[in-house]
Amino acid sequence: MGEAPAQIPTSFGHELRACLRCRLVKTYDQFRDSGCENCPFFKIEDDHERIVDVTTPNFNGIISMMDPRRSWAARWLRIGKFAPGCYTLAVSEALPEEMQFICQQARVQYVPPKRI
């Protein structure tokens, strides 16, 4: 594998949130304590108000990805280069423009959700 795995959610209730950029799923408290393993440039562990800006409780489905480089599902979902962990299949909200600008400054790609 190579890279360190992301934290696995400690509960599966209403406190789950998904990162709007990479779709990593963790609890609010986990995002507050350690941020997003795939999106460290957001620095949400330092700015707790930013958690609400870059994550959402509204998402569809969860997949556990253990070996991203070999997973066909990870390639299909375009999460094959992210840390092993739990990911949502889809988010319906877009990342706010200010956060999209941070992605551009960090030279990382942001793909908005598809309109269904």
UniProtKB/Swiss-Prot annotation:
Disulfide bonds: none annotated. It is found in: Nucleus. GO terms for molecular function: zinc ion binding. Its main location: nucleus. One of its GO terms (cellular component) is nucleus. Keywords: Activator, Metal-binding, Nucleus, Repressor, Transcription, Transcription regulation, Zinc, Zinc-finger. It comes from the Eukaryota. The keyword Transcription applies. InterPro entries: RPABC4/Spt4 (IPR029040), Spt4 (IPR009287), Spt4/RpoE2_Znf (IPR022800), Spt4_sf (IPR038510). Pfam families: Spt4 (PF06093). A zinc finger (C4-type) spans 19-39. GO terms for biological process: regulation of DNA-templated transcription; transcription elongation-coupled chromatin remodeling. May regulate transcription elongation by RNA polymerase II. May enhance transcriptional pausing at sites proximal to the promoter, which may in turn facilitate the assembly of an elongation competent RNA polymerase II complex. Belongs to the SPT4 family. PANTHER family: SUPPRESSOR OF TY 4, TRANSCRIPTION ELONGATION FACTOR SPT4. This is Transcription elongation factor SPT4 homolog 1. It comes from Arabidopsis thaliana (Mouse-ear cress). The lineage of its organism: Eukaryota, Viridiplantae, Streptophyta, Embryophyta, Tracheophyta.
